[in-house]
Amino acid sequence: MKVIKREDLGKIIKDGDTVAISGSGGSGSAEELIRGISDSFVKTGHPCNLTVTCGISPGNLTNDEVGMNMLAKEGLVGKAICAHLGMGRVFGNTIGKNQFPAWAVPLGVINHLYRAIAGNEIGVLTKVGLNTFADPRVEGCCANEKAKALDPFVKLVNIEGKDLLLYKSFPIDVAIIKATYADEDGNISFEHEAVIGEQYNMAIAAHNSGGKVIVQVEKIMMKDGLRARDVLIHSSLVDYVLVAEPDTSLGDYNLPVYRPEMTGDKKIALDEIAIRPLDERKVCGRRSAMELKKGYVVNLGVGMPDSVANACAEEGISEDIYLSVESGPTGGVPIGGVAFGGSINPDSVIPTAEQFDAYNGGSLDMCIVGLAQADEDGDVNVSKFGTRVTGPGGFINITQNTKKVIFIGTFTAGGLEEEIKDGKLHIIKEGTIKKFVKNVQQITFSAKNANENNQEILYVTERAVFRLVGLGLELIEIAPGVDLEKDILDQMEFKPFVSPDLKLMDERIFKEGKMGLKI
């Protein structure tokens, strides 16, 4: 193991290398290492034409020069294979603008690919992605036109009469990893990391590909200064270590200090978690929480689903269920926004690949995920809007393999203004963007799969609740205060089935104070 400085990155990483970058959105970004690559390119033009691969791309949901945004320089990246690009918006925009070929791959597949590469396997063979945009019969994971012009990344195969997808392995030349400590030998530990993601499999994948493993740490401990059980990456896998400056060794972009309640080293009272004001997000969170049952294992997606965690904390039912995040934590209360991926008071934190092993096998009782577009068939899009590419993240793995799926979001978008008063929903200004459309732009969730798998599917908004039936969406509830024709049916590009038993949403959802929710 050799200790390096940021300025050394340009000499270690070569033009055309495939570079795997760890991190989970706002958490665990190897910020100083990424900046070293960017700085070298700006100064010398090298390294260039890199193939970069990541799960949830490091970033803070802005155009700031952080995370993957630092790599959004023309000529630096030649290809990208990522699961989610929404956190690093500038980098995602370069893909939408067709600057270089890119593939948007399910997060569970990316993590399992690192494991397959480490084991010198042909790839990942799975049902995950069938009948979605990942399926080569649809778009084959292509995130832009340049990708469509190249050899397919994923292949449809049939084994014993079953259609499966083969996501093909590729060698990794460099792994870029953030950790907490290294010892003098190069053993690596992750005590301060809220997410133990893909780092271990990524390191072995690079090492077994004949590549290099570079780790950013807070501090180098003396020899034998780490407990063996705390070491997740052995020194034999590590080529270089960089000790980061304090301002680039963040837990995440919004939480610059170590948060022991996110690593299991401390518990805090859940009443310390801020209670949401009574708004449309809270309405959606409360209505979704009403579907929970005691003992459920539940995944919450990024964005509005974090309102469900708030609702559970406010109602005092957080300990009656197990909230799970695809990045690895289970138990406690998941954090939303930039810090998504970590949880407060988690019961366990496991590597992301192992979390997806459980998810793919059906361990989740329910998931609550975002709703950006839904169409008359019940398909959902959360991964592409115009030329803006976000990618699926863990959405496909989760929604395809969970017994009960709830999509949650406002009914329209784009300037929507609403008020909740006197137990009713008042629409002040309608959104300019319809979410319930004739055909979604990209299929991230396949209603065809759901019907074949007998999954229970709900679409929860602040003014209406739908369920998936064999031929499309059925409207089953509307909010008090809204007009069925003007506020719901006229705001859709198709006509749903309207249940003969259509009823009002529970009035408690629209009132101040606790609901008194019991599960």
Regions found by a protein language model. Name each.
Residues 48, 274-277, 282, 286-293, ...:
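Glycine-rich phosphate/ribose-binding loops and adjacent secondary-structure elements
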Residues 50-52, 213, 298, 323, ...:
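Hydrophobic/aromatic residues located in beta-strands of well-ordered beta-sheets
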Residues 17, 46-50, 78, 295-296:
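Nucleotide donor/acceptor-binding cores
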Residues 39-48, 74-77, 315-321:
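Conserved S-adenosyl-L-methionine
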Residues 187, 267-280, 287-299, 304, ...:
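Glycine-rich phosphate/diphosphate-binding loops and the adjacent beta-loop-alpha structural elements
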Residues 18-23, 51-55:
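Short glycine-rich or small-residue beta-strand-to-loop segments that form or flank ligand, phosphate
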Residues 2-11, 25-41, 56-72, 76-269, ...:
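Conserved phosphate- and dinucleotide-binding cores of soluble alpha/beta proteins
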Residues 5-18, 170, 283, 287-297:
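Glycine-rich phosphate/diphosphate-binding loops that line cofactor/substrate pockets in enzymes
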